[in-house]
């Protein structure tokens, strides 16, 4: 577990931002907890994929942030990117609703659930909690991940400009409370969560994908190609 949980595996830009956070006492406790969990039970994602979001989207490359909650708890689903599943895996309901809104918004129809190409373009697909016990949603909540991902969000808010934060659901809004005091530096798009329980309460019809590209165009930055190969 030690090799899978070292700061050296992160891009240098994230290492520079998170070095102090990594050495905090709560992070040592989190590492001990994870070492026990991975040795005694099944945990998702695989150890090497815990930090896929940070590996895929270096700090200086982040243009958009999409916050999730915790990884999918089913076998073969979680691979370190919020809402995403590996190629060939059946689409979870929330991702199906995301794709439904994308098709309504921009006419783009995606059939594969791997969102890696989005991450490669600067979309940070970050969960609030980065691990989960198999079959047990939120089982790793309250162990330290929330504080660590708070630090990630805070670093982006304080040390970057013109990042587009996409907040789906109340948990994401609460996570970014600091953001609402920094609106001069960043853009905020908020809507209901795409889960089947909430999507009809404001996620469908939010047009966030076209709005993201509109904002990027205004900033004279490349737009996101939402079409997945």
From Swiss-Prot:
Gene3D superfamilies on file: Uracil-DNA glycosylase-like domain (3.40.470.10)
InterPro entries named in the record: UDG_fam1, Ura-DNA_Glyclase_AS, Uracil-DNA_glycosylase-like, Uracil-DNA_glycosylase-like_sf
The terms describing its cellular component in GO are: cytoplasm
Under which EC number(s) is this enzyme classified?
3.2.2.27
The reaction(s) annotated as catalysed by this protein in its Swiss-Prot or TrEMBL entry are: Hydrolyzes single-stranded DNA or mismatched double-stranded DNA and polynucleotides, releasing free uracil
Molecular function terms from GO: uracil DNA N-glycosylase activity
Keyword vocabulary terms for this entry:
Cytoplasm, DNA damage, DNA repair, Hydrolase
Q: What is its main location?
A: cytoplasm
Please provide the Gene Ontology terms (biological process) for this protein.
base-excision repair, AP site formation via deaminated base removal
Q: Where is the active site?
A: 70 (proton acceptor)
What are the subcellular locations of this protein? Cytoplasm
In the UniProt record, does the keyword DNA repair occur?
Answer: yes
Q: State what this protein does.
A: Excises uracil residues from the DNA which can arise as a result of misincorporation of dUMP residues by DNA polymerase or due to deamination of cytosine.
Q: Which PANTHER family match?
A: URACIL-DNA GLYCOSYLASE (PTHR11264:SF0)
Tell me the protein family, please. Belongs to the uracil-DNA glycosylase (UDG) superfamily. UNG family.
Q: What is this protein called?
A: Uracil-DNA glycosylase
Species name for this entry?
Answer: Chlamydia felis (strain Fe/C-56) (Chlamydophila felis)
Q: Which gene encodes it?
A: ung
């Amino acid at each position: 577990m030690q090799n899978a949980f070292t700061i050296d595996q992160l891009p240098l830009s994230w290492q520079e931002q998170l070095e102090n956070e990594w050495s905090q006492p709560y992070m040592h406790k989190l590492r001990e907890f994870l070492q026990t969990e991975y040795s005694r039970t099944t945990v998702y994602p695989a150890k090497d994929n815990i930090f896929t979001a940070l590996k895929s989207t270096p700090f200086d490359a982040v243009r958009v942030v999409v916050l999730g909650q915790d990884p999918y708890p089913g076998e073969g689903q979680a691979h370190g990117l919020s809402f995403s599943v590996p190629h060939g895996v059946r689409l979870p309901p929330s991702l199906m609703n995301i794709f439904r809104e994308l098709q309504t918004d921009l006419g783009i129809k995606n059939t594969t659930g791997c969102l890696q190409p989005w991450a490669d373009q600067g979309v940070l697909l970050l969960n609030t909690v980065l691990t989960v016990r198999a079959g047990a949603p939120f089982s790793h909540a309250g162990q330290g991940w929330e504080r660590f991902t708070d630090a990630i969000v805070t670093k982006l808010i304080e040390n970057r400009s013109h990042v587009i934060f996409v907040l789906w659901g109340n948990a994401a809004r609460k996570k970014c409370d600091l953001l609402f005091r920094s609106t001069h530096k960043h853009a905020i798009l908020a809507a209901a969560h795409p889960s089947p329980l909430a999507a009809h309460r404001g996620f469908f019809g939010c047009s966030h994908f076209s709005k993201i590209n509109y904002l990027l165009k205004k900033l004279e930055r490349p737009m996101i190609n939402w079409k997945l190969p």
